[in-house]
Amino acid sequence: MRRFALGRPFVSGARRLSRGGLIDRSRSIRFRFNGKTYTGHPGDTLASALLAQGVRLFGRSFKYHRPRGIVGAGAEEPNALVQVGEAGYSTPNLRATQVELYEGLSAQTVNGWPSLKHDVGAINSMFSRILPAGFYYKTFMWPRSAWMRYEHFIRKAAGLGRTPEFPDPDIYDKRHIHCDVLIVGAGPSGLIAALTAARSGARVILADEQAQFGGSLLSASSTIGGTRAVDWVKKIVDELRTFPEVKLLNRSTVVGYFDHNFLTINSRRTHHLASGDSDPRMSRERLWRVRAGEVVLATGAIERPLVFDGNDLPGVMLSSAVTTYIRRYGVAPGRTGVVFTNNDSGYQAAIDMAWAGMKVVAIVDSRRFPGASVARETEALGIPVYKGHVISSARSGSEGLNRVELS
């Protein structure tokens, strides 16, 4: 068994890079998180802005209230649920990785009492042996009339957002629309599909949940035909905008796919704006009801986490998320790190970490024979590679993740 000490904790050493990313460093945005004021930049999400300032604790687990940090960089994020806004503008259970930063944004975590750092609910872990899965459905059954009182405290302890207590001042609308081709996802495949259909004269709708089109290319360091990936995306999108029969829907999630190519799309039209900055006549959200001749699903993929003891600790992140924070948001999520992988993408994450000035202690590859090209690149950077090994456990101290063990 090998042990690696990470030195200064992984996430507490996070910092903003002086180069790279798609953020506007010339402007600063002030916002509040859990009552404390922070600053970020246009192009940041709430998660990236907080990571850049060393925030590592974003929530508590559902049952034992174990500390939780950022794992992903988008819709796959399971931990960083926040309540955004106040009074009638309050919205619960949004992912910090999807909340775009704007001036005056106010957010707070949805659990942890009296505070996120000092959560009384963490005492539950001491009684884990007598709190099996679903214990509350078997334990609090008598007297039956008391269940509603039990439920109030059980749900509060679980920790989800609060339903707004004031009327919603915003407006919402819906639209019906027909198209020849609906493309779901605006990554490289979706963009090419949209451009090909548009050039044929078809009526096209391109929908993507992110603020910017490009998908994985927004955090890619590669080139396409000698052009930087982000510049290639801009070129394609600019051409798409010249077609009158093409509708581009960013910040829009396809939420339903029904018979006969009937789909529904939820467009978040003003979520990225402060309440006083949006046109009061403009709807906050719009539901598109689409009848499509053909549907192209170009939704990409989500990385699956590897399993080991302690993989839920703050500081354990998906390699794709690390790359995204470095390349798209200009944030190094730590000073040191270990990469655990079973495919070549982990090596690219290690290369990105080294580019960001992080010390990559090791790459742990469960395969005995990794891809030759990525192996050569990491060897040139002097990064040790442990082939045919796995991480068996991760441990943390008072300030964050500080040690991993291999087997």
Regions picked out by a protein language model, each given a short descriptive name:
Residues 2-407:
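Residues forming the flavin
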